[in-house]
Swiss-Prot record:
Substrate binds at S147. This is Gluconate 5-dehydrogenase. GO terms for molecular function: gluconate 5-dehydrogenase activity; NADP binding; protein homodimerization activity. Belongs to the short-chain dehydrogenases/reductases (SDR) family. Catalyzes the reversible NADP-dependent oxidation of gluconate to 5-ketogluconate. Is involved in the non-phosphorylative, ketogenic oxidation of glucose. Is almost inactive with NAD as cosubstrate. Displays high substrate specificity since D-Glucose, D-sorbitol, and D-mannitol are not oxidized by the enzyme, and 2-ketogluconate and L-sorbose are not reduced. Can accept D-fructose as a substrate, with a rate that is only 10% of the rate of 5-ketogluconate reduction. It comes from Gluconobacter oxydans (strain 621H). Signal peptide: none annotated. The gene is gno. GO terms for cellular component: cytoplasm. It is found in: Cytoplasm.
Length: 256
């Protein structure tokens, strides 16, 4: 096996949730550049169509699958439709996620429930639905998008931190249950990246100054810097890697 083949995704089909923008869209494009046939998932058809047009403008191809990852029945039906109409899902990037910020003592039940529904329940719903098809085939890659917030806490985002801690340990549980069937399930944990979700923090000079001093790399991450890790975890290069969470964080989790 040559070195390029080790990381090639040619012939593999990848479902990426929350793929209409941000990290999900960037990872989807990255997988496509390494040869994967990408299926973009989201709840909004117009947003997905726009994302698909962006693929075509860059000479890439993608299909779309509109369903709500927080609705288990919709997930089961959506995954089944992809398998039936497009072909087997070889790679799942469980990316869909949201953020809510407020002091913990003021945090609303609705915001708590929304976070749990999107950040935790959806990872289980989509992971389970896809794994049910992967297991009989004896192969498959699942990459759950985690966060450094599973290891670090900051004021105002305690519930988000709780959801990402849950995803980290759900990843380990998935690997324990499904590894025996030939699946590899791992996590990719971004540090502080400049995305739509972090626009307010990027614009906050005081926070950015603190972050750059706190991070050995001395800067915000750029979303394209997540692609290499995603390709590794999606490819044959990680065939004996299971239940791990790969931190892509510029070193912030190892620095005091």
């Amino acid at each position: 096996m040559s070195h390029p083949d080790l990381f090639s995704l040619s012939g593999a089909r990848a479902l990426v949730t929350g793929a209409s923008r941000g990290i999900g869209l960037t990872l989807a494009k990255g997988l496509a550049r390494y040869g994967a046939e990408v299926v973009l998932n989201g709840r909004n058809a117009e947003s997905l169509d726009s994302a698909q047009s962006g693929f075509e403008a860059e000479g890439l191809k993608a299909s779309t699958a509109v369903f709500d990852v927080t609705d288990q029945d919709a997930v089961i039906d959506g995954v089944a439709a992809i398998e039936r109409d497009m072909g087997p899902i070889d790679i799942l990037i469980n990316n869909a996620g949201i953020q809510r910020r407020a002091p913990l003592e003021e945090f609303s039940r609705k915001d708590w429930d929304d976070l749990m529904s999107t950040n935790v329940n959806a990872v289980f719903f989509v992971g389970q639905a896809v794994a049910r098809h992967m297991i009989p085939r004896g192969r498959g890659k699942i990459v759950n998008i985690c966060s450094v917030q599973s290891e670090l806490a900051r004021p105002g985002i305690a519930p988000y931190t709780a959801t990402k801690g849950a995803v980290k340990n759900l990843t380990k549980g998935m690997a324990t249950d499904w590894g025996r069937h030939g699946l590899q399930i791992n996590g990719l944990a971004p540090g502080y990246f400049a995305t739509e979700m972090t626009e307010r923090l990027v614009a906050d000079e005081e926070f950015t100054d603190w972050l750059c001093k706190r991070t050995p790399a001395g800067r915000w991450g750029q979303v394209e810097e997540l692609v290499g890790a995603a390709v590794f975890l999606s490819s044959r290069a990680s065939s004996f890697v299971n239940g791990q969470v790969l931190m892509v964080d510029g070193g912030i989790t190892v620095s005091l």
